[in-house]
Amino acid sequence: MKTEVKICGLKTAEAVERAVALGASHVGFIFFPKSPRNIEPDDAGRLAARARGRAKIVAVTVDADNDGLDEIVSALDPDVLQLHGSETPERVLSIKALYGLPVMKALAVREASDLERIDPYLGIVDRFLLDAKPPAGSDLPGGNGISFDWRLLDALDGSVDYMLSGGLNAGNIADALALTGARAIDTSSGVESAPGIKDLTLMEAFFEAVRRAEA
């Protein structure tokens, strides 16, 4: 499969094993108490051991302090840190210096002007995760099952390395790939039967849809 696929918000051994068997390039574990996909660092570490060496391990955090990051990095030994809060470029630099890990910075997109927020992070983050801006009043910065207008990415400089996220599922991934040319994609709620509950059948359908889109 040419497209990198990240399955995020994993909480069970069965889901981790299936994601990797289907061809996931990345598996994500979410450390954010307000999320239905939240997982304790030690539990995530045990699950990550099932994928290590076959998929990249991603720790997803939201404005975590150094003590929180220390615990997560120690337990999970991630390949990538995904920062999904309001972390500034300065904070990203500090985190990279502390842990020596690649950083993927999530940015919320609803309109063209939101893409201007990429510029201050260029040369600092290793990759962006472009997600849909959450609805008003939502406690979750991601995993809300909504998409943004993918045509906005037409204006994006082709040198910007990003992973596309936001409401991706088996029914829309072909259009998303065709419109954006994205080489890396992320899904969480799109392969769930309920918030935080991964559905293996939906996961299989998602990978099959990606393969058909690539054909």
Swiss-Prot record:
Record Pfam families: PRAI
Q: Among the record's GO biological process terms, what is one?
A: L-tryptophan biosynthetic process
Q: Which Gene3D superfamilies match?
A: Aldolase class I (3.20.20.70)
User: Which reaction(s) are listed as its catalytic activity?
Assistant: N-(5-phospho-beta-D-ribosyl)anthranilate = 1-(2-carboxyphenylamino)-1-deoxy-D-ribulose 5-phosphate
Q: Which HAMAP family match?
A: PRAI
Concerning its family, UniProt says: Belongs to the TrpF family.
Q: What is this protein called?
A: N-(5'-phosphoribosyl)anthranilate isomerase
Q: Which organism is it from?
A: Rhizobium meliloti (strain 1021)
